[in-house]
Structure formats: structure tokens, C-alpha cells
């Protein structure tokens, strides 16, 4: 999950997936490095770059923001080397509210595409375009399995 490892994949002539949710940075520089270094091989005749990102869709933006609170609170706590889970949305929201002036919060909020189905789909399309990705992998997040499944259904159904 770096431009260097992406270039290595390109030199090997294989496909490449850039995991934004691990690297905590946009995939564009890595997909560009991959494409620039790509050499055809027995595996691939042409480059194929994918980006893996986090998304959460709900019926409304407000509901999606509410459902994203545990993920975001956990990510912010993780930046302080505090590994913790937030058992309720309310506890997570309280944690975020108490840290609303934390200068790292905007970066945490930007790590995932969160909103209504139409907003998330537009965000995913924009991400693919900006990154030069042939394909996106969506890591569905949410406080329950049902929430994650519903999110993917909403994204697919738009």
C-alpha cells in the first residue's frame, strides 16, 4: 500500500489493489506508479489497478453519519494508541463530540465515503476517476452485519 509496492506489482506484470483504508492515503499516486511501471507478462497484458476503500450508505445522510460514529470514534481513539470498541452509537457520538476540536478529526472523517446511497455512489465514482482505478473494492462498515449488508444493497440499488 505504497507507490513503491504498486510499482513493484507493475514491474511484475500483475494486477494491483491499493488499500486506502490501510494506508490512510489516496490511491492516485500508487495507481499512477503502477501504470507507469507496468510491463506485460503471462499474468496480464495490460495494467489493472483497483482501489479498496471504506463506504457506508443509509437511507439518509444523517442516518449514515450516525451509523458511522463507532467506526470514526474507534479510528480517532486508535490515533492515540487506544484500541477500543464503542458498544453503542451514542457512546461513540459522545466520544466524537468531546473531541470535535481535535485537529485530526477531519482526516478521520474523510477516510470513508458516508451518506445516502446516491451520495456514496457518486463519491465512489469520483474516487475511481481521481485514482485512475479500473475497479473499486468497498469495505462495508457499520455497527452490525445487517447495517453493512443494507449499505451494500443501497449502493448497488442506486
What is each model feature region?
Residues 2-25, 30-31:
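A conserved active-site cap/scaffold subdomain adjacent to cofactor or substrate pockets
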Residues 2-6, 24, 61, 117, ...:
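Residues at or immediately preceding the N-termini of alpha-helices
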Residues 14-19, 47-54, 134-139:
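Hydrophobic faces of well-ordered beta-strands that scaffold small-molecule active sites
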